[in-house]
A protein has these predicted regions:
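Substrate-recognition "cap/lid" segment bordering the active-site pocket of phosphatases
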Residues: 105-106, 126-128, 132-145
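Generic structural signal for beta-strand residues in well-ordered domains
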Residues: 1-3, 118-120, 128
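Catalytic-core regions built around general acid/base machinery
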Residues: 110-123
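N-terminal helical cap/lid subdomain that shapes the substrate entry/recognition surface
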Residues: 3-108, 121, 133-136
Length: 145
């Protein structure tokens, strides 16, 4: 395919275009402390990694089928596993809402310049992701997305 035939460039969201700021363990620590958690960042990171991997395995076994309901359930399970001692629906909601806020994210340093150059060359730019519906509000609040 010739470059002149390319009309759009599609970017993945998390890990390619944007990332949580502060990182997930730090955000989880702040939220967890509000509910009495005394976990260290290392403990949170370890528990998160294990819980996330378990959910990834479940999704892989199901053929990667997802939905808004499944995404909410998977994240609620992850939060519950990380904060087993203090887990509550309110803690989950706090974190769910936190990661829907553009202020909890930042674009990588090279994104704005890259997107500007591509737009100047006439390409349409898109973000495609398996992130749930919260991504739309995050992108709306993060220039240049």
């Amino acid at each position: 395919m010739a470059l002149s035939q390319i009309k759009a460039v599609v970017f993945d969201a998390v890990g390619t275009t944007l990332m949580p700021e502060p990182g997930i363990p730090a955000a989880y620590a702040v939220a967890g402390q509000q509910f009495g958690s005394q976990l260290t960042l290392a403990e949170i990171r370890d528990r998160f990694d294990r819980a996330f991997a378990r959910q990834e395995a479940i999704d892989a076994a199901a053929g990667q089928v997802t939905s808004e309901q499944r995404e909410r359930e998977r994240w609620e399970t992850i939060v519950t596993e990380v904060f087993a001692e203090v887990a509550s629906p309110d803690l989950f909601t706090l974190l769910w809402d936190y990661f829907a806020d553009p202020a909890a994210w930042r674009t990588f340093d090279d994104v704005a310049d890259c997107w500007r150059q591509l737009e100047q060359q006439g390409y349409r730019l898109c973000v495609a992701s398996n992130f749930d519906s919260r991504l739309a509000s995050v992108c709306r609040g993060l220039p240049p997305l």
